[in-house]
């Protein structure tokens, strides 16, 4: 049980932190810069959001097998960094509360782009970052589909897989009290 909590905590924390940072950076670049193909890239990211995970699962599984990434946490964390839903909410928040004038003032003062993003933009996005971190953490914590495909070792399994194994261990002698206590922990 403790291994499942720790494994889920590691995966969910890494996913939440990395997805909100890189999604905010992507949203910042599309919101602030004017470049050719900006609208196409924005629409492409939104289009990706409509594709369910299950559609690409077979190719993803075979790629993880070929690259030797099965039974590791990398295939559970790295693809979650490119979170189109988090990107969409971040860019919507930026459109409503991030004035371009502040960014231009930072550029005039000699601030580089990464410094501007990390020291000026991110603190202004704290409410959106907090909300999206919670959403990303919960979504990653509750993810059952990909960990059940990728993780084989019992010591690396996450909480949803352990709960499912507990529920289906013996379907004739099924103790819901034990399952609910396990979920509570």
Language-model features: locations:
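A structural signal for multi-pass alpha-helical bundles of membrane permease subunits
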Residues: 1-185
């Amino acid at each position: 049980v403790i291994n499942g909590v720790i494994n889920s905590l590691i995966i969910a924390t890494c996913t939440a932190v990395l997805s909100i940072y890189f999604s905010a950076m992507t949203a910042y670049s599309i919101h602030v810069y004017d470049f050719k193909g900006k609208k196409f890239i924005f629409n492409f990211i939104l289009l990706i959001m409509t594709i369910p995970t299950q559609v690409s699962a077979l190719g993803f599984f075979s790629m993880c097998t070929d690259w030797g990434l099965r039974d590791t946490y990398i295939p559970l964390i790295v693809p979650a960094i490119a979170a189109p839903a988090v990107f969409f909410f971040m860019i919507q928040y930026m459109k409503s509360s991030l004035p371009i004038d502040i960014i231009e003032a930072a550029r005039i003062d000699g601030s580089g782009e990464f410094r501007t993003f990390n020291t000026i933009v991110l603190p202004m996005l704290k409410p959106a970052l907090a909300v999206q971190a919670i959403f990303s953490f919960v979504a990653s914590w509750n993810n059952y589909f990909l960990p059940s495909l990728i993780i084989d070792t019992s010591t690396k399994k996450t909480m949803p897989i352990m709960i499912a194994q507990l529920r289906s261990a013996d379907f004739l002698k099924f103790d819901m009290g034990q399952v609910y206590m396990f979920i509570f922990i």
